[in-house]
Amino acid sequence: MKGKVWKFPDDVDTDIIIPGRYLVMRDPEKLREHVMEGLDPEFPSKVKPGDFIVAGKNFGCGSSREHAPLALKGAGIAAVIAESFARIFYRNAINVGIPLLEAPGITEKLNEGDEIEVDLDRGVIIRGDDEFPFKKLPDFMVEILEKGGLIPYLKKKGDFKG
């Protein structure tokens, strides 16, 4: 995965990722139009498919809503790389097919606009000649992500009758 870095602070909550007034929407493409607008109203028009969000601690805190990772998916975010994540957001994002990569100290190493590559197999973020490690995902989570999320994963395994 290769793309541009968009940087955000600590404690970005789900209401910032997608404001509550848009919870009537379920379509990721519609949610995309409002993703992160609380911090950067122009973000939806600037972000490109394959870009990365790099954030501080506790990304995805606040309300437990699937709309937040769906909005990121609709925006084409390749992965969110953060110092740490809120636990429920972490599972919701994996379930909809968004990789979340925990990389302590990453906000000191990457800048907005950096072009990076993420190597999930090696567990590294690459910027030019520099490599920064992240906590590798468990194999079962990688499988879920490779299938596009939990429901496609279960359908392919034959464990989902829906």
UniProtKB/Swiss-Prot annotation:
Catalytic activity: (2R,3S)-3-isopropylmalate = (2S)-2-isopropylmalate
Pathway info: Amino-acid biosynthesis; L-leucine biosynthesis; L-leucine from 3-methyl-2-oxobutanoate: step 2/4
Superkingdom assignment: Archaea
Gene3D superfamilies reported for this sequence: Aconitase, domain 4
A Gene Ontology molecular function term of the record: 3-isopropylmalate dehydratase activity
Keyword flag Transferase: no
InterPro entries: Aconitase/3IPM_dehydase_swvl, AconitaseA/IPMdHydase_ssu_swvl, IPMI_Swivel, LeuD, LeuD_type2/HacB/DmdB
EC number: 4.2.1.33
GO terms classed as biological process: L-leucine biosynthetic process
Keywords: Amino-acid biosynthesis, Branched-chain amino acid biosynthesis, Leucine biosynthesis, Lyase
Keyword Calcium: no
Family: Belongs to the LeuD family. LeuD type 2 subfamily.
UniProt subunit comment: Heterodimer of LeuC and LeuD.
Physiological role: Catalyzes the isomerization between 2-isopropylmalate and 3-isopropylmalate, via the formation of 2-isopropylmaleate.
The protein's name in its UniProt record: 3-isopropylmalate dehydratase small subunit
Protein's organism: Methanothermobacter thermautotrophicus (strain ATCC 29096 / DSM 1053 / JCM 10044 / NBRC 100330 / Delta H) (Methanobacterium thermoautotrophicum)
